[in-house]
Amino acid sequence: MSLPATFDLTPEDAQLLLAANVHLGSKNVQVHQEPYLYKTRPDGVNIIHIGKTWEKIVLAARIIAAIPNAEDVVAISSRTYGQRAVLKFSAHTGATAIAGRFTPGSFTNYITRSFKEPRLVIVTDPRSDAQAIKEASYVNIPVIALTDLESPSEYVDVAIPCNNRGKHSIGLIWYLLAREVLRLRGALVDRTQPWSIMPDLYFYRDPEEIEQQAAEEAAAGEEDDEAKEEVAAEEQTEAADWAEGQSEEVASW
């Protein structure tokens, strides 16, 4: 698929894709994923062609931007590494997020509270989100999926080839997808200017890591308070010594 020059992959985005290990695929390859295979390393790991990845990101973004009501797009991730990314994507684009377990019947059983009638479904992993893809096929909802080289492509209309198991890779794909959607909608007018949102915001964060960071910040804050108190005490001591010296001079006069 040839893209207009405006949509070409920039060196900066290519570096992001490589740094996030988007190009690292699985050791097995499904027959439908062979067009996205770049080469195989000596250790058996297959490399994904990031140029094909970028083409599919642009195609998916154009499909998403063509839907008038953003809430009719449902972003799904039962995989832990993709839940934060899905929530951020929905916050920035206005889509509906399903982060966590997908409730069976959400697309087919109108009696359930979680019933939805989306016009487009985006999933993080065709294996872990198989229930959502299956129900979407029952009601003719097109599906966009982040797929590895060994991922099944049944009922998937647009496959974005990438490493859909790494937390950085998943977060970056959702980030680039959201950025391209906003550009196509006109929210980000100048393509030469970087988006103010950083890709790190889409990356999964371990709760223990967050608690540890908060504890370190609290400890650092306590140390700063203690240091300020020590400085204030020293200043008070110096002021008292100076005042005492002045009083002695006055007394000697």
From Swiss-Prot:
Could you name the domain of life of the organism this protein comes from?
Answer: Eukaryota
Q: Which GO terms describe its molecular function?
A: structural constituent of ribosome
Q: Where in the cell is it found?
A: Cytoplasm
**Where are the residues of the annotated region Disordered?**
212-253
Arranged from A to Z, the UniProt key words for this protein are: Acetylation, Cytoplasm, Ribonucleoprotein, Ribosomal protein
Q: Which residues carry this modification: N-acetylserine?
A: 2
Spans of biased composition, class Acidic residues? 219-238
Q: Give a short account of what the protein does.
A: Required for the assembly and/or stability of the 40S ribosomal subunit. Required for the processing of the 20S rRNA-precursor to mature 18S rRNA in a late step of the maturation of 40S ribosomal subunits.
Q: Any idea what this protein is called?
A: Small ribosomal subunit protein uS2
Q: Which organism is it from?
A: Eremothecium gossypii (strain ATCC 10895 / CBS 109.51 / FGSC 9923 / NRRL Y-1056) (Yeast)
